[in-house]
Regions:
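Alpha-helical transmembrane segments of integral membrane proteins
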Residues: 224-445
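Gly/Trp-centered helix-boundary motif
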Residues: 1-246, 253, 399-422, 429-430, ...
Length: 445
């Protein structure tokens, strides 16, 4: 144990190991944050949600930070409502139980592109008589554009670019250009815009609330996909999923392999022969093809795939490598001494044989994590990912299916790819440093 402690202290001598450990701790911190911020059930609900969950977001919107690298500033997405006080609302009582509701919101538009869409969600309260609303759009040069006049139900959505009354008044002009262009120059008019909602209620206790959604060309820190989903959900939750899959597969595989190799070496005979024959058969089995068949015909669950991955990875060439070392250790003097004082087979295997392999196990365990992380993403890209969990591989699969690279949605591919590279690089740097520390022959390389 003292040797292990001293070896771990040597990590400080390797800058690559320090960098790897730092990145791993950052990934772990992101994992903890994701699990706390977005609980498992909520993450699944969000990722499987449709228009009812993500309908207010723009489609195929790059991250907001894209504006820092572009000469043209694209409009940001935002949402305001009367419920949280971000939209101004006043109510004036009238005669015979009528009332007038004035709702407005002003914002400064200093962008070089048009929004994808603007929409208003109405939430009204009434018994029998529907409220009536008039929606107006006020431009920086003082023009007042009527969007629509209509009676609203208790829950109703108005999309500016799909409203028939508004479209008919444009005579074929694009709705967003009609709202944001200067009619004199036919270019975007920058300045302060205002959306006005004037509502009339016809019953005592009747009320109108509204939400205004401005769907810009960029959104959030990670952007959105074809279903308007915020990719940050999958990027955050993909971190604990990737680390859990990689670490569990690595630990389960290498530890089990070492134990089986130790048992076969110690008992020898038919037990050792059986283990070697199973290993040789497993070495010629099509590993990826079996995983694809399991995912296709049995289950897409990531935990089922994890179990099969561990089973297929146990009887590999590592068993023969461990066996060669255990054969030498088995003939050591301290093993003979343990036999002499009557130590049991289990005690010798788990307290004398296996501990001698730990210095070789640790670097291999750390270095093998990226391979299993990439395996999970590979299966997801092949369409065999977990159907409910948001993962990095699922993001790449969706991007590939929707032709992200051909359509210029590079962020959709790059974000999960960079996270996969960081994960692989962090464990690789730490693993190589540990290999040098625990293997003296590599220290001068």
């Amino acid at each position: 144990m003292n040797t292990l402690k001293n070896s771990f202290h040597e990590i400080l001598r390797y800058p690559s190991a320090i960098a790897g450990v730092t990145l791993i701790f950052l990934l772990l911190a992101v994992s903890v944050y994701a699990v706390i911020k977005i609980p498992y059930s909520q993450a699944i609900y969000l990722w499987r949600g449709g228009e009812d969950v993500w309908g207010a977001n723009p489609k195929f919107a790059p991250p907001a930070w894209f504006n820092f690298f572009s000469n043209k500033k694209m409009p940001l997405s935002f949402a305001v409502s009367t419920a949280d006080g971000t939209m101004t609302k006043t109510f004036t009582a009238g005669a015979q139980n009528t009332g007038t509701v004035n709702i407005s919101y002003s914002f400064d538009f200093q962008y070089d592109g048009y929004p994808q869409e603007m929409l208003i969600n109405f939430d009204s309260k009434y018994a029998q008589k529907q409220p009536f609303v008039s929606i107006n759009w006020v431009t920086p040069d003082g023009r007042n554009i009527r969007i629509d006049n209509l009676g609203i139900s208790q829950q109703q959505t108005l999309r500016f670019s799909q409203d028939q009354q508004f479209l008919q008044s444009l005579n074929g002009q694009d709705p967003m250009q009609a709202l944001f262009n200067d009619p004199k120059t036919n270019k975007i008019l920058k300045g302060k815009y205002q959306v006005q909602i004037i509502g009339v209620t016809f019953e005592q206790g009747s009320d109108i609330n509204a939400q205004f959604f401005f769907q810009g060309q960029v959104y959030g820190l990670a952007g959105t996909d074809q279903y308007r989903r915020d990719l940050m959900v999958a990027l955050l939750w993909g971190t604990p999923v990737a680390l859990a899959f990689g670490l569990l597969a690595s630990i389960g595989t290498l530890v089990t392999t070492m134990i089986i190799a130790a048992i076969g070496t110690w008992y020898g005979g038919w037990i050792d022969a059986l283990i070697q024959r199973i290993t040789e058969i497993n070495l010629v089995l099509p590993y990826l093809a079996i995983l694809i068949m399991v995912g296709t015909f049995y289950s897409h669950s990531i935990w089922v795939i994890l179990g099969v991955t561990i089973l297929l990875s146990i009887f590999t060439g590592s068993i023969k490598s461990y066996r060669a070392i255990f054969v030498q250790v088995k003939e050591s003097m301290y093993i003979e001494a343990a036999r002499a004082y009557g130590a049991s087979d289990a005690r010798i295997i788990f307290l004398y044989l296996i501990p001698r392999m730990i210095p070789l196990l640790i670097p291999g365990l750390v270095s093998s994590v990226p391979a299993f992380v990439f395996l999970e993403s590979t299966l997801a890209i092949l369409g065999l990912g977990d159907p409910v969990l948001p993962t990095w591989g699922k993001i790449i699969d969706d991007a590939f299916t929707n032709g992200a690279l051909y359509k210029g949605y590079y962020y959709w591919i790059l974000e999960p790819a960079v996270l996969l590279m960081i994960t692989g690089l962090s464990f690789a740097m730490l693993g190589f440093a540990l290999d040098r520390i625990f293997n003296p022959r590599l220290r001068d390389i």
